């Protein structure tokens, strides 16, 4: 369904997303890392670490944070901000759960 | 045969300790016979409360198993009670009509639990808490019934109550006195304890006297003297113990409350001794274990004709963790006309400390909530220390490390450090100096010290520090594993074992992690420790694996992966090379490179292609990415080489096949060279083997990376089988004692080569370690094959989502 200002794209069934692990999702020209956290909520961020472009989808997840597998930068899945002592941020995306499915909203 | 007949009546802790002491003095002097009324070998009765809690198995509390009796030529009769001693003819008679002559006799009949002489005490569901049978009764009842009543709010009753709570029962504790544990605590500490235990879920009925146990065949409730009553499906009587003097009395041996003994544990009848709870010494029959171990020592020396100081009675100290609450009491702890107290009471933190003085001498102490000062105060009480020089309040403050003198430095080697297990200072020093123990954990494993209540651990550490001096690195033992916790690696591993924890999330939860889901440091570490401790049952937590180990491939900087198939010993053939070549072409893999480990690396494979690449290769994973065995490099060796004295390729391949996939604290690299020219570079490997004429040399702790280190010569062996066996023992010891992410080089520097050698030279330890290693190896499966069989996991990990909007 498309309306004027907001696009909603289906990523898949929520039960198909592995828990506390990332999934690489390609939408148009974007590459996202989508995480299903242990509390069942969904987070999506761009799949590139601001340090050297590492793939965040493969990182270890703890609570609301993911650790980049390349050099262990710690990134918030809430607001995309890289935690001290490092600096930077990643783009975050909004997601929506409807019934059995997860949607990306942008 | 010439040996004297020694008969022990009673197979419990005190009696058997006396036998152990006798054996250590005069192994072959006596022909020993033991009679035990219970059907079990010698076990630690005190740990029954842990069995009740579900924490521990019966076999874990066994002090001496059936083998011990055989190994020491002791004739053991279980399930047999001695009913009479014929002091004239020097024989004992049992209920199986057996007549056993003796030259020397020891009575160690222990205590009988006191059962209230009230109507209903013989109903089903009413039990004491003395032996394994009682414990089984309580465990069985907890599965069927809900309400438990414990009569007796002393030490034993509270331990029983804690156990029953753990089993899911509703527990009420009935006590005659106005506060709990009045034998060990004063009113203030007793009430603090009650508050704590009520928070844990226990209900208390104080100043209540039970008049009748009501019910039909089975108990249904209790009725009290004041007319009130409660319901109960299980009643545990923990109202006290009485020395078991029946045998003594029936045989004409003088008894009072207990069997009367002198300062050398002799009864009034020649050649008959008594020890333990059944004995009465200077009017006291002891119910705690530390004095009984002291008695056993004196008895043994006296019986063997060795000069010994007489037993003069014990100053009692109790250090307990009742239900997780720290409680300590020692000496004479109640105030009176001549005895005055100094108290510190912190209501906010729930800490209460009191010392009792007679004039300027410290005679007693009670600590609640923080009992870390217990050992120091007890030492002062035993020495009848004069405190006139010390400022009053500072007695109760912990002394700083430099300012205070160490407690243990002033102790003689004979003095007992661990009261629960009767371990002396000398025994601990021996363990350090002769057996190479260099941590409290190792001393615990070697001597048993600090393995029960744990209260003596600070003293054990002190002795370690003094004995090892600058070699003792306290900080290595205490470093927290990451910022999420204050616990060190040893502490975490201990807790996992003690509490039977089985998932990373459970560990972080139960041990109070600051962050509930940990961090990139501790999650993989916990996953490793859990799997190391329980290899067959633990289910690996893939979310706690670093990406390489989760994907079973090496991630590259651009998000592609490298694939390294197994090439045992660096040996290949045309079939495998053709398979590899075909796969490279089919998947257009950009880079093919030889690795340092003597195999082929296919670099630049896309994530979603990995399962198909593995399927087409049809070779096992080379684990080039893991905290595991990497490779066993080899030189050509005697199969072709002019110089090789041994077949290095065959041994290398055997080693790699045996240990592939083993989870280790960090990567392990091995090599086998066929002669000292060392073409396989065995000198810089975690475990390197070098062939010599007639055998192999094993080198350990080498490292060819950032911290270059030459390996140390561990040992020389003759056969391939020995190499495999000792490699297994060595690696298992590394797995069990190293910190996660500690290479063998760092670990070996820390624990010391001679210590490792002493472990490997101990046949018993070798057997145990190899047993655990083989158990671990038995569950290994090739991960690439696994993925091919588990389509769902493959999809979750390797497939990307590509949407169409």
From Swiss-Prot, chain A:
Q: Which UniProt keywords apply?
A: 2Fe-2S, Cytoplasm, Iron, Iron-sulfur, Metal-binding, NAD, Nitrate assimilation, Oxidoreductase
What turns on expression? Answer: Positively regulated by TnrA under nitrogen-limited conditions. Induced by ArfM.
Q: Which GO terms describe its biological process?
A: nitrate assimilation
What does this chain do?
Required for nitrite assimilation. Required for activity of the reductase.
Report the enzyme's class at the first EC level. oxidoreductase
Report the SS bond pairs.
none
Highest taxon in the source lineage: Bacteria
Q: Name the species this protein comes from.
A: Bacillus subtilis (strain 168)
Q: Where is the Rieske domain?
A: 8-104
In the UniProt record, what gene is named as encoding this protein?
Answer: nasE
Named from the GO MF annotations, one term is:
nitrite reductase NADH activity
- Catalytic reaction annotation: NH4(+) + 3 NADP(+) + 2 H2O = nitrite + 3 NADPH + 5 H(+); NH4(+) + 3 NAD(+) + 2 H2O = nitrite + 3 NADH + 5 H(+)
Q: What is its EC number?
A: 1.7.1.4
Cofactor(s) in the UniProt record: [2Fe-2S] cluster
Description of how the protein assembles with itself and partners: Associates with NasD.
> What Pfam families is this protein classified in?
Rieske (PF00355)
Matching entries from PANTHER family are given as:
3-PHENYLPROPIONATE_CINNAMIC ACID DIOXYGENASE FERREDOXIN SUBUNIT, FERREDOXIN-RELATED
What are the annotated GO cellular component locations? cytoplasm
User: Any idea what this protein is called?
Assistant: Assimilatory nitrite reductase [NAD(P)H] small subunit
The record's subcellular location field reads: Cytoplasm
Q: InterPro entries from the entry? A: Rieske-like_NirD, Rieske_2Fe-2S, Rieske_2Fe-2S_sf
Enumerate the SUPFAM superfamilies for this protein: ISP domain
Cofactor stoichiometry and binding remark: Binds 1 [2Fe-2S] cluster.
Q: Where does [2Fe-2S] cluster bind?
A: 49, 51, 68, 71
